[in-house]
């Protein structure tokens, strides 16, 4: 399945064209890179005989909502481990969690301190004690299978026509897929949601090409943060 390349009409220097790839049109809920990241994970969960998907995220996580949507569409029970306990009794006040719950997701709220240990064996074992057997998808959805899905974002035409491909970077999965599938003469540019060089190290675990770079000048303090400069740009 391919998305649509929509031309953006801006006053740009001669010879430069800007397009946005409408990955959000792939699915009404499992949209954008989430569709790509979950595609092969869903297939693997089915192959292994799992009936439950478990994943992690914050209260406004698009990934949480996408997994809930995938579960509803493909017949999986879904469990979301949510960072922070402040909304445990106020789910209806949060549109992301409310929609995920409507789609059948069960929530388990944990403190931010406990959440930092989410990938530790002891923490995962405790989750198995609570919820039994499940197929675990990491926070943000990034793993080898997710990257395989993201390698399908660029079509053969895209790899020839576009000289530069830019995307937002959170956990590094989407840009890793773009890098792996990029054309010989393409440059891949990632704009990080977070400050720090750690993302480049994460990406290097998944790619061998060097036609990419990460720009962290526009993180504006990280997820969920805004300042006057960002508000002015949006307006």
Question: What is the predicted function of each stretch?
Answer:
Residues 1-235:
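PLP-dependent amino-acid enzyme catalytic core
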